């Protein structure tokens, strides 16, 4: 079984208990405007250009079989539409420019790998997981966008008696989610917005399937040992007001009786530079990072609703 990942991040401390390895799968049905990993959205491998590394050797232009790279007045110009048509579908000569870029200014985002190769990588830290109470966290992208690959990773990890976690927006068929649950110890559920129109505006999809899956996970928790935490990224001018968080807390209390932990994650700017690298435009350039006082103000809503402020 093979899938496409774009990173394995070892020694993570923020996506579950203990010390963990985060496995980032490519592909996501959402297109959140603030996404910090835009290279995770496309399910295929894609080209990234790091301008600061380019030495101007012109090898990429000579070796591109599809004419996607040309020389502008000051820098390379990449027609990513041509790349998507020919290279992202991995036709003959796909990403030949990368092979000729000795300065490593051109890179392929994503790599095809097997379950066995993933396990070989994460098992390097097996003793650390056991001593720290850690394990693996499968994230992305959206893990359920590669359901069979995800299932096999989780199954192989549980066979080694290693703790497993998933970070998911839950935009997937329930049957797909349910199949994986016997091999999952911990789930982070992303709850971005309650209002359906707002959710569609900022993520590109309705949230109705997501909300239904949250309810089903709460029901599942009644009879199964599994930790579930709701997570909301706090995005200025989108969901950073008291009323929005108040309504989300109300909904959690009313619809997710088995789930008590809720975590608010402050917006950060770490992913902004990635957009230009893959030929995309970052739409939320004016956003400021939420202040500590703003985050505490919003967290008070969690406590007032009798929920637990989660910290991971």
State what each model feature region is.
Residues 1-62, 66, 71:
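Flexible, acidic/Gly-rich N-terminal and inter-domain linker regions that tether
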Residues 2-17, 222-223, 234-312:
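Auxiliary Fe-S-binding modules of radical SAM enzymes
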Residues 27, 55, 113, 243, ...:
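Conserved active-site and cofactor/substrate-binding residues in soluble primary-metabolism enzymes
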Residues 35, 104, 190:
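ABC-type ATPase nucleotide-binding domain
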Residues 43-183:
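Conserved Radical SAM active-site core
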Residues 49, 200-206, 279-287:
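Short glycine-enriched, charge-decorated loop/helix-capping segments at active-site entrances
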Residues 116-270, 276:
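Conserved AdoMet/S-adenosylmethionine-binding subsite of the radical SAM
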């Amino acid at each position: 079984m093979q899938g496409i990942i774009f990173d394995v991040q070892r020694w993570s401390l923020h996506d579950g208990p203990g010390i963990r390895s985060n496995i980032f799968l490519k592909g996501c049905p959402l297109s959140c405007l603030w996404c910090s990993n835009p290279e995770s959205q496309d399910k295929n491998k894609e080209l990234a250009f790091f301008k600061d590394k380019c030495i101007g050797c012109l090898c990429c232009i000579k070796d591109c079989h599809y004419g996607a790279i040309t020389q502008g007045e000051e820098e390379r110009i990449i027609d990513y539409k041509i790349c998507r048509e020919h290279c992202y579908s991995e036709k003959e000569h796909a990403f030949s420019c990368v092979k000729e870029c000795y300065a490593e200014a051109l890179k392929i985002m994503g790599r095809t790998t097997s379950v066995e190769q993933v396990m070989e990588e994460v098992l390097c830290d097996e003793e650390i997981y056991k001593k720290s109470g850690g394990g693996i966290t499968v994230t992305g992208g959206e893990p359920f966008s590669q359901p069979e690959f995800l299932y096999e990773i989780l199954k192989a990890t549980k066979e080694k008696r290693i703790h497993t976690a998933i970070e998911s927006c839950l935009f997937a068929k329930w049957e797909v989610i349910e199949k994986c649950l016997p091999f999952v110890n911990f789930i982070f559920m992303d709850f971005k917005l309650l209002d359906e129109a707002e959710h569609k505006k900022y993520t590109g999809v309705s949230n109705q399937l997501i909300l239904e899956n949250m309810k089903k996970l709460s029901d599942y928790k009644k009879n199964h040992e599994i930790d579930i935490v709701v997570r909301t990224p706090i995005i200025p001018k989108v969901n950073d007001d008291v009323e929005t968080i108040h309504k989300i807390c109300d909904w959690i209390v009313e619809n997710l009786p088995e789930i008590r932990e809720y975590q608010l994650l402050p917006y950060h700017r770490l992913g902004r530079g990635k957009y230009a690298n893959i030929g995309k435009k970052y739409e939320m350039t004016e956003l400021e990072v939420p202040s500590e006082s703003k985050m505490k103000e919003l967290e008070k809503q969690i406590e007032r609703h009798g929920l637990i402020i989660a910290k991971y």
